[in-house]
């Protein structure tokens, strides 16, 4: 049986038609429900569709030009974006057409039926594509109530038949008007038109009644509507907002009226007509307001003729769905052109804040697609019409009140939560409240606003924010401003004090007496049975055999003889075995039991004897016994070193143990970026290896929130003798003051002078002192050679030593010590010229350069390293065979540490020291080191030592050990005496000096001296006529000595300047006169009636530059209108001016009035004073350490 040509049968499995759900299927279903017409390709009806031929003809005519490209592009994008797409992808038209033909090959049909069906199918694709051309951008399924609806205005543009004024015509799908219609459709249209006419008459009568509504009824109606709107959902259309938003678009642009693409619905037509008539009816009510400004009439006129379509557009944009199309931009531009700037601001104040609160989230173009709204139009039409008039009346009335309030109280604009609010004085609360009423744009009376404010929670944050913003100007213009002015008027010492307070690093102090501290376990020592059997005599003999270990203290544990007796964990012993440590060194044998028992220890041993491992192994056992770290906890173990290189080396020695035990360590030292070190500490670390200065920086950073010392219970000071000298002692004590009182403290060093003992005992409790091999002794494995030779022969001897060494061992390393940084770089250049690859390291270099240099030296990239004493402590290089003291060390401890860089861990090495005949003060320390280590003393060195002792006895020389023993106190005295270098070294380590009263007085004294010198150098403002008389008077007057002569005490530059100026004045007899009998050269045609001079020859170069550079002079010329000329010649200090030559360098100021010349002279005097003070400060400043200069 033949199937009718338009009847529908199930599609084959996998068919694109059966598996695909189109975006506008919901819209088609609704259209089919409304008018009984179906726009799908096939219908379920058994009767044929007579409109296929007409539809095909219209479609071929309209889409002939862009047929192929348009279909192919839109079809691929539509099917890609459809969320319900399940079938195979149709990439092009040919593939789709081939598949479509194959689907119906097995069906019986006539040729004409086939063609019609194929055309109908293609037409169906065209219909599906036409609606989706605009929605490809969104990438979302549209047409449902859950998704943002889209506009089909493109379809309206493509229609050949334009819409009429009443809105009859157009459908939800963009399709061509139908040429033929059934009789039923014609009857339906007639019935709808009849209903429409009846409805119009009804609305006209209602509009006439609304014109007579008084303002009180309008306000009551608005109050009820606001209550309803507050409880409604965000998707419910608010009539009041719709009416308020209606002026958002104007009918001046023709495109909105012509491109309306809504479906043919009498309810939509009724809504549109009602809005139009409501606006027309509201004209008399708006015009009846008295005192309405003329400028408001323009937007009101536009609002009365606005249709429902632009009204919905405003609501959508107010809620965030901004349509950036050409029509909206044109409308906005025209509205701004009609209004002046002031009116535009007011409209922002009164209108915009209300939109985000009650705006509808349904876009205007798809309003008729919402099924829930379609049935409620009739219920809301009367309220919408009434609210439209009331909204216009209320807004205009609010604008009038706002204008009145502005004239009375000149408020300030303050932004609150994206809106613009009016901010008044606190003394006028009522106008401020009224401004908020205008901002909300809801209810005109104040009581209605307050009632609505209590009910609605959305507006409360806005009010709170407004109150907070109001207080800010009050605080800004309060008494604090006058305090600031007083500070500005104060003396310079107050500013210096503020600056120093900001620079000062304060560590938050912790009072452990008020904190409950968890007890910790420190004693892990259990004496092995084999040690407990030893008698006291046997223990004494054992200690004597182990390089003569000497111990002091109570209950000293017996020394161990192998690693298994130390009480270490299995993991630690495995790492020790992997590192190849066969048995403990003498210092380790005695120090490990003492540290494992939780006692404070002072360890003194020769260089290279394994002191680092002696304090690291007990620390790991100590940390593992404590609870794990929490987020805000600081480290448990703290190791402090005097040099950065030593800190890096200790951190490197920790790494093999850290990975095995699951611990973390941070190396913090100056010169490296503190940001990375803070990040590592915040991640958590049980151990921190640091220098004191950087540790203080970390503790003071971020008000002490970076790290803390609350959990530090194991503290190590390596090279402890230097930690309590060299300026470290105050920093170390500041760190110790923030630690727990029950901590365990360990001090290790190769040298420990007796003068330091009293300082070390301050941080120790009942310590055990362990000394191996004596204090300040060079290891016996080191061969010491001391040569007394002149300075020129040193370099040739260095070349000889290097040649002999590298002939024997090409892989050997050589370390050359010098006294000063400049000498290190000079020696580097000379050795490089001789063909020896080498590098230098000293405190004047950046830390990254120092780190890379040490690394390259250890790896053998460069075999020779030239260094100052910064590399004398802790540096451990395996192949270091030769140490050369190019400049002899001036004390014993420095010599021991320099020589101890070689001959480490049982290896042998050579230390060669050059001593010049003039360095008799170095001879006693070097000779003592040779004696203690059993080395022969050269005869010339012994003679120099005796000669120095004679000088000391006679008072001609002073015997020093290299240690002050008083920390900063001693160093401060040296800095004050030298006035140079050590101050900057101290500050670089992190300790800033406080600004004392003496320093303030010095600053004031400097400023006064500079001012006196400038006043003496500047002349008074003289008239042109008085110049000759002054010259004659100067000739006849005898030289008069003034009291301005200053005695040159400390060779201060300011004193020199004052003395020179006073000498000039006493010689010339008049302040500022350049030379007796010499007239001022201001007789040119441009010479002013008044002039003044300012001699600048004897001031510092920076001061002279301040008053002669083009920028400063140009500012003075522009401000005063004077003429400023630099005259004379510059004569260095001490050089007299030849007879008949140009005078000393001075500045000539000329002007027409005395006032302008005096003003210019005052400004030049100020510049000269500032430049002089800056020059003096620059001279008193030293480089990084006072020894290194960049050439």
UniProtKB/Swiss-Prot annotation:
Subcellular location: Nucleus
Example GO molecular function: RNA helicase activity
Motif Q motif: where in chain: 561-589
Start and end residues of each Helicase ATP-binding domain: 592-770
Enzyme class: hydrolase
Keyword set, alphabetical order: ATP-binding, Coiled coil, Helicase, Hydrolase, mRNA processing, mRNA splicing, Nucleotide-binding, Nucleus
UniProt-listed Enzyme Commission number(s): 3.6.4.13
Spans annotated as Disordered: 1-436, 946-1008, 1025-1051
Biased composition annotated in UniProt, kind: Acidic residues: 358-384, 990-1005
Pfam families: DEAD (PF00270), Helicase_C (PF00271), KH_12 (PF23469)
Family label: Belongs to the DEAD box helicase family. DDX46/PRP5 subfamily.
Protein name: Pre-mRNA-processing ATP-dependent RNA helicase PRP5
Organism (species): Gibberella zeae (strain ATCC MYA-4620 / CBS 123657 / FGSC 9075 / NRRL 31084 / PH-1)
Phylogenetic lineage: Eukaryota, Fungi, Dikarya, Ascomycota, Pezizomycotina
């Amino acid at each position: 049986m033949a199937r009718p040509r338009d009847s529908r049968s199930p599609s084959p499995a996998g068919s694109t038609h059966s598996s695909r759900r189109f975006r506008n299927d919901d819209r088609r279903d609704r259209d089919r429900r409304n008018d009984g017409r179906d726009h799908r390709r096939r219908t379920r009806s058994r009767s044929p569709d007579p409109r296929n031929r007409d539809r095909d003809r219209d479609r071929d005519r309209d889409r002939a030009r862009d047929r192929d490209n348009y279909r192919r592009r839109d079809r691929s994008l539509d099917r890609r974006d459809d969320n319900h797409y399940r079938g195979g992808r149709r990439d092009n038209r040919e593939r789709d057409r081939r598949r479509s033909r194959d689907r119906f090959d097995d069906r019986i049909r006539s040729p004409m039926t086939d063609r019609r069906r194929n055309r109908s199918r293609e037409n169906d694709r065209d219909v599906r594509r036409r609606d989706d051309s605009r929605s490809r951008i969104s990438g979302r399924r549209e047409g449902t109530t859950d998704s943002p609806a889209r506009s089909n205005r493109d379809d309206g543009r493509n229609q050949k038949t334009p819409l009429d004024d009443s809105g009859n015509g157009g459908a939800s799908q963009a399709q061509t008007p139908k040429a033929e219609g059934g009789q039923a459709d014609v009857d339906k249209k007639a019935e709808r038109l009849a209903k429409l006419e009846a409805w119009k008459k009804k609305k006209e009568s209602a509009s006439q009644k609304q014109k007579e509504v008084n303002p009180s009824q309008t306000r009551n109606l608005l109050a009820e509507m606001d209550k309803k709107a507050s409880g409604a959902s965000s998707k419910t259309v608010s009539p009041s907002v719709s009416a308020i938003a209606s002026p958002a678009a104007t009918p001046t642009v023709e495109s909105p009226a012509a491109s309306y693409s809504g479906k043919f619905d009498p309810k939509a037509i009724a809504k549109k007509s009602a809005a139009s008539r409501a606006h027309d009816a509201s004209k008399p009510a708006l015009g009846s307001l008295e005192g309405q400004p003329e400028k408001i009439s323009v937007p009101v006129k536009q609002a009365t003729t606005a249709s429902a379509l632009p009204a919905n557009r405003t609501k959508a944009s107010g809620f965030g769905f901004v349509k950036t199309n050409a029509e909206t931009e044109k409308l906005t531009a025209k509205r701004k052109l009609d209004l002046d700037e002031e009116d535009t601001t007011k409209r922002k104040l009164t209108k915009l804040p209300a939109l985000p609160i009650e705006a509808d989230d349904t876009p205007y173009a798809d309003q008729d697609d919402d099924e829930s709204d379609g049935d409620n139009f009739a219920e809301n039409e009367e309220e919408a019409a009434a609210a439209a008039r009331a909204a216009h009346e209320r807004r205009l009335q609010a604008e009038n009140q706002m204008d009145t309030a502005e004239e009375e109280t000149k408020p300030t604009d303050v932004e609150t939560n994206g809106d613009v609010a009016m901010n008044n004085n606190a003394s006028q609360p009522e106008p401020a409240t009224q401004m908020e009423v205008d901002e909300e744009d809801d209810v005109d009376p104040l009581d209605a606003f307050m009632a609505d404010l209590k009910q609605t929670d959305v507006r409360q944050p806005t009010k709170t924010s407004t109150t907070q913003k109001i207080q800010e100007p009050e605080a800004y213009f309060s008494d604090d401003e006058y305090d600031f002015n007083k500070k500005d008027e104060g003396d310079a010492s107050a500013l210096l004090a503020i600056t120093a307070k900001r620079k000062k690093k304060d560590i938050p102090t912790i009072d452990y007496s008020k904190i409950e501290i968890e007890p910790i376990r420190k004693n892990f020592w259990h004496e092995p049975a084999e040690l407990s059997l030893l008698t006291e005599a046997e223990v004494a003999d054992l200690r004597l055999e182990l390089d003569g270990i000497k111990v002091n203290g109570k209950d000293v544990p017996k020394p161990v003889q192998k690693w298994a007796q130390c009480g270490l964990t299995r993991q630690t012993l495995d790492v020790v075995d992997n590192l190849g440590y066969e048995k403990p060194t003498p210092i380790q044998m005695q120090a490990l039991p003492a540290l494992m028992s939780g006692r404070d220890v002072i360890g003194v041993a020769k260089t290279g004897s394994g002191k680092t491992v002696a304090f690291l192994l007990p620390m790991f056992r100590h940390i593992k016994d404590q609870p794990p770290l929490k987020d805000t906890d600081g480290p448990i173990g703290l190791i402090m070193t005097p040099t950065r290189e030593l800190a890096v080396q200790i951190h490197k020695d920790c790494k093999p143990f850290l990975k095995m035990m699951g611990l973390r360590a941070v190396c913090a030292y100056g010169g490296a970026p503190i940001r990375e070190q803070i990040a590592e500490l915040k991640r958590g670390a049980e151990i921190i290896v640091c220098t004191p200065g950087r540790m203080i920086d970390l503790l003071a950073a971020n008000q002490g929130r970076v790290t803390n010392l609350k959990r530090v219970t194991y503290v190590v000071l390596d090279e402890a003798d230097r930690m309590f000298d060299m300026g470290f002692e105050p920093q170390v004590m500041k760190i110790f003051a923030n630690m727990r009182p029950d901590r365990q403290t360990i001090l290790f060093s190769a040298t420990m002078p007796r003068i330091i003992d009293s300082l070390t005992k301050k941080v120790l409790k009942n310590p055990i002192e362990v000394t191996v091999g004596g204090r300040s002794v060079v290891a016996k494995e080191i061969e010491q050679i001391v040569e007394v030779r002149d300075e020129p022969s040193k370099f040739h001897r260095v070349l000889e030593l290097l040649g002999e060494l590298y002939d024997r061992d090409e892989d050997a390393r050589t370390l050359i010590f010098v006294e000063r940084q400049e000498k290190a770089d000079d020696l580097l250049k000379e050795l490089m010229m001789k063909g020896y690859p080498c590098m230098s390291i000293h405190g004047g270099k950046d830390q990254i350069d120092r780190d890379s240099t040490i690394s390259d030296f250890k790896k053998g990239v460069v075999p020779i390293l030239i260094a100052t004493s910064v590399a004398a402590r802790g540096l451990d290089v395996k192949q270091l065979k030769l140490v050369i003291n190019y400049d002899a060390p001036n004390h014993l401890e420095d010599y021991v540490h320099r020589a101890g860089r070689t001959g480490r861990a049982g290896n042998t090495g050579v230390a060669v020291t050059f001593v010049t005949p003039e360095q008799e003060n170095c001879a006693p320390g070097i000779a003592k080191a040779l004696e203690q280590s059993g080395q022969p003393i050269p005869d010339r060195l012994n003679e120099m030592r005796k000669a120095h002792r004679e000088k000391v006895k006679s008072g001609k020389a002073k015997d020093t050990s290299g240690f002050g023993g008083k920390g900063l106190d001693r160093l401060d005295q040296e800095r004050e005496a030298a006035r140079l270098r050590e101050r900057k070294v101290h500050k670089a380590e992190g300790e800033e000096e406080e600004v004392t009263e003496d320093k303030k007085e010095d600053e004031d004294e400097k400023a006064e001296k500079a001012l006196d010198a400038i006043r003496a150098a500047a002349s008074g403002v003289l008239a042109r006529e008085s110049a000759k008389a002054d010259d004659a008077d100067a000739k006849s007057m005898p030289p008069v000595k003034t009291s301005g002569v200053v005695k040159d005490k400390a060779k201060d530059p300011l004193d020199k300047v004052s003395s020179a100026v006073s000498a000039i004045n006493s010689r010339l007899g008049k302040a500022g006169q350049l030379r007796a009998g010499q007239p001022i050269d201001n007789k040119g045609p441009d010479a002013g009636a008044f002039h003044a001079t300012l001699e600048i020859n004897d001031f510092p170069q920076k001061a002279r530059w301040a008053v002669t550079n083009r920028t400063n002079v140009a500012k003075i010329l522009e401000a005063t209108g004077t003429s400023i000329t630099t005259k004379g010649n510059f004569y260095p200090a001490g050089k007299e001016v030849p007879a008949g030559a140009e005078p000393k360098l001075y500045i000539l100021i000329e002007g027409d009035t005395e006032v302008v010349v005096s003003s210019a002279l005052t400004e030049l005097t100020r510049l000269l004073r500032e430049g002089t003070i800056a020059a003096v400060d620059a001279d008193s400043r030293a480089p990084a350490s006072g020894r290194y200069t960049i050439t």
